[in-house]
Amino acid sequence: MTETFNPQANTVFCRKYQQELPKMPHPPFPNKKGQELQETVSEKAWKEWLEQQTMLINENHLSMLDPKAKQFLTEQRDKFLDNEDYERAQGWTPES
């Protein structure tokens, strides 16, 4: 049996950009939430979130061992991906 190329298998309807975009090659987490994110968030949106997350961690001196820091980042991630108002790093300005 030969596999046919299905371009939609490599795209997702991105919840941030509200359009079909290339999907992440792998789930970002090895759990159900990671699978859900891979199916609803584009690779572009995820890369942008990782940049934001890094700035938030650095600026706020967050420890990934602290459950409160993890919860904060989870909340900010969901807001970012849903185009809601989220806490931005103070030194960050959006590209125009």
Curated annotation (Swiss-Prot):
Keyword Iron: yes
Biological processes, Gene Ontology terms: cellular response to oxidative stress
Function: Could be a mediator in iron transactions between iron acquisition and iron-requiring processes, such as synthesis and/or repair of Fe-S clusters in biosynthetic enzymes.
Gene Ontology CC: cytosol
Domain of life: Bacteria
Family assignment from sequence similarity: Belongs to the Fe(2+)-trafficking protein family.
GO molecular function, a single term: iron ion binding
Keyword terms, alphabetized: Iron
Pfam families found in the cross-reference section: Iron_traffic
Protein name, as recorded: Probable Fe(2+)-trafficking protein
This protein's record includes keyword Disulfide bond: no
